[in-house]
Amino acid sequence: YKRQRNHYNELAVTLDQKAQERNIVIRFRLYDDGLGFRYEFPLQKNLNYFVIKEEHSQFAMTGDHTAFWIPGDYDTQEYDYTESKLSEIRGLMKGAITGNASQTSFSPTGVQTSLQMKTADGLYINLHEAALVDYSCMHLNLDDKNLVFESWLTPDAVGDKGYMQAPCKSPWRTVIVSDDCLLYTSPS
């Protein structure tokens, strides 16, 4: 069996909220073929139990890339993939949603991760998450005027996105970039 390489450079940025004496760490890891980041909530006096209401991670695209996507849906992933430009997602969404009794689409431009894209220059971009433990799964909502994706977490019945206890951390938000689409399926 072959071991996976896990070589990266790391930067941890601590943001302090002085009025409430709380902080959060945003941890970045840069790899040869992409990056990951996550939010960490250290053990601290003024933060114990808390509720995630929203997450606003954003991914700005450099162009109107070709995307391979399925509709963002809280209840099912049983869709065929649609291939389109990012700017075409809104117009194609209604046709991409097939008849199914358990569907909860959240936006006319919302897609599920993993989202694969191809640039005009032949680069492949993949947006996804990793180490999803005790946290809501991430979809992506596209601002199709500015070509910016924003994280969209699956809510519970009352709209909350997570019940947390410090110390804790979010899943990794991942961006893989490669000129080889097989990189995503390669075991090495």
Residue ranges with predicted function:
Residues C137, L142-K145, S151-A157, P167, ...:
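Ser/Thr/Asn(+Pro)-rich, low-complexity disordered segments
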Residues Q17, F59-T62, D73-L142:
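Extended, low-hydrophobicity, Ser/Thr/Pro/Gly-biased non-transmembrane segments
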Residues Y1, Y184-S188:
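Conserved small/polar residues in nucleotide/adenosyl-binding loops
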Residues P167-L183:
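Phosphate-/polyanion-interacting regions in eukaryotic proteins
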Residues A67:
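Short aromatic-acidic-glycine turn motif
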Residues R22-V25, P42-Q44, G99-Q103, T109-T113, ...:
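Short alpha-helical segments and helix-capping/turn motifs at coil-helix boundaries
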